[in-house]
Amino acid sequence: METGLDTNARKNRSGEITETLVARIFNNTGIHYREQVSSKEFPAIADVLGVDQKVFDFVISTDAKTYLIEVNFYSGGGSKLNEVARSYTDLAPKINGVKGFEFVWITDGIGWNSARNKLQEAFAAIPSIFNLTTIISFIDQVKKS
């Protein structure tokens, strides 16, 4: 039992560390954001999600667009990566179909080496996928909008 709990604790820590790193990047580049924002704050998003309401890791609002952002990190492979990719592949078109909103996925980690095909499939459905190296291009996009 303890082993399983330790594994989950490690997974949660890597996700929290990545969120902290992304927040630091946003702070250092002058990006204003909110953390842990419910989809219920945006009636049009709540409508398209229906019962599948979500809490986004970050939300960035500009004059032109509101970016709803999910962040994660995978240090190992497994079914979780495939499930998250599938889930976000379903979620992104719903959000992106609402005028003024865009779904953004920031993900990284060597775990993706074993799930490259799922990540490639996700790229086809989610225009805004970034990692910790390419996040600067997202920041540039935000600053221009």
Task: Give names to the regions the model predicted.
Residues V51-F56, D90:
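Alpha-helical scaffolding within the catalytic cores
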Residues N72-N117, E121:
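Catalytic cores of nucleic-acid endonucleases
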Residues A23-E35, T62-K65:
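Secondary-structure boundary elements
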Residues N8, N28-G50:
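A short acidic/basic microdomain associated with nuclease active sites
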